[in-house]
Regions:
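Flanking scaffold residues of small Cys/His-coordinated metal-binding clusters
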Residues: 3, 19-22
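Residues immediately within or flanking Cys/His clusters that coordinate Zn2+
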Residues: 5, 24, 113
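Short cysteine-rich clusters marking metal-coordination/redox-active sites
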Residues: 8-11, 27, 116
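Cys/His-rich microdomains that often coordinate metals
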Residues: 15, 31-32, 120
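Cysteine-rich micro-motifs
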Residues: 21-32
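Exposed aromatic-hydrophobic patches
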Residues: 61-62, 98-105
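Short acidic/polar inter-strand loop motif in beta-rich domains
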Residues: 117-124
Length: 124
């Protein structure tokens, strides 16, 4: 199942759906909206994750041009989707927009997501 993320338009809560049973996800009394990757009007080269795998470690850099990591504009988290599941790492202003994930033997990367506090979700 492709990883899907949802946001509450009222409070800003974001969730990752683990299993889709067809029932809408509700927050603040209303259905949450699915976040569709890459739909914000922003620089692709600073938002799309760039990843490599070396010796079972997935190295992710956000953007082919490094994304800013300022308090007012930064990557909040990076999520890795694999054949066997998913992992997520949080980032904070002042840090480099880079993370690493370990893969178990036989697992493979399916997608990498990055969430920008201003420009929403991006996928590679």
């Amino acid at each position: 199942m492709e990883q899907k993320f949802y946001i509450c338009k009222h409070c800003g809560n974001i969730i990752a759906k683990v299993k889709d049973t067809g029932v809408p996800v509700i927050c603040c009394g209303e259905p949450m909206s699915e976040i569709v990757p890459g739909t914000a009007d922003a620089a692709v080269e600073k938002h799309v994750p760039v990843w490599t795998v070396e010796n079972g470690i997935v190295h992710v850099k956000v953007g082919s041009v490094e994304h800013p990591m300022l308090p007012e504009h930064y990557i909040e988290w990076v999520s890795l989707q694999t054949k066997q599941g998913n992992q997520r790492k949080e980032l904070h202003p002042g840090e480099k927009p880079e993370v690493c994930f370990a893969l178990c033997e036989g697992d493979e990367v399916e997608a990498v997501y990055a969430y920008c506090n201003l420009h929403s979700l991006w996928k590679a």
